[in-house]
Amino acid sequence: MKLIIFTGLVLFAIVSLIEAQAENERACLPQYQVCTDAPGNCCSNLVCDCYGRYKSGTRIGRNCFCLQKGVIYKREN
């Protein structure tokens, strides 16, 4: 009985380790890629930065991109 419980715990630990490793190996989104639907998938040196789109004062959508952390982007006229 103890052997069955021990074997079950070992198998559970192995499966958990495999799942954690697969989570860490998922592909990250590179710079300037759209991250609207996946805000946590930008690569480690990037952050998912979102901007609202407006037309005549009414919000018509939202865009999110993987951008460098700490960088401020300004509109050029």
UniProtKB/Swiss-Prot annotation:
A single Gene Ontology CC term: extracellular region
Tissue specificity note: Expressed by the venom gland.
Cellular localisation: Secreted
Primary localization: secreted
Signal sequence, start to end: 1-20
A Pfam short name: Toxin_35
Entry superkingdom: Eukaryota
Keywords: Disulfide bond, Secreted, Signal, Toxin
Annotated propeptide span(s): 21-26
InterPro entries: Spider_toxin_CSTX_knottin
GO terms, molecular function: toxin activity
Reported modifications of this chain: Contains 4 disulfide bonds.
Family of this protein: Belongs to the neurotoxin 19 (CSTX) family. 08 (U8-Lctx) subfamily.
Name of the featured protein: U8-lycotoxin-Ls1s
